[in-house]
Amino acid sequence: MGEILTFTVAGSPQTVSRAIEEYARGEGRVTAIVVPWESDRNTLSMAVTAVKKDGWAIEHTNLGTIRLTDAGDERTTLAIIAEPPDHPERAQLTAVFERFVRQVQSRFHVQA
């Protein structure tokens, strides 16, 4: 398991996860989807994958996990865990994940 980054944002875990999914879909290089079997009542787990398309073929490479925990008062704590892939393009994929994390941080209101 890789580096962990934690911060708190406004909104419930469900609202924030939907916003992250939509943002990732619009960005195009990564997907971020809720993984129901790794989630529970208070915490949602999201898989972040790189997407590479070649004609009809689509390759997904796991880059990391986002855990969204209800912090009360319509706030959510995000824990973002990098999981560097065992892949020939590891450095490039790590850079894609790091860029996505920075964009998520800057896009969502980070609370102290």
Region roles according to the model:
Residues V34, E38, H60-L63:
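Glycine-rich, flexible loop segments associated with nucleotide phosphate handling
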Residues S39-E59:
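Amphipathic, interaction-prone secondary-structure segments
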Residues K53-A112:
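Beta-strand/loop substructures that line and gate deep hydrophobic ligand-binding cavities in soluble
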Residues M1-P36:
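Terminal, regulation- and interaction-focused segments at domain boundaries
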Residues V30-I33, M46-V48, I58, V110:
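Hydrophobic transmembrane signal anchors and adjacent membrane-proximal interface regions, especially
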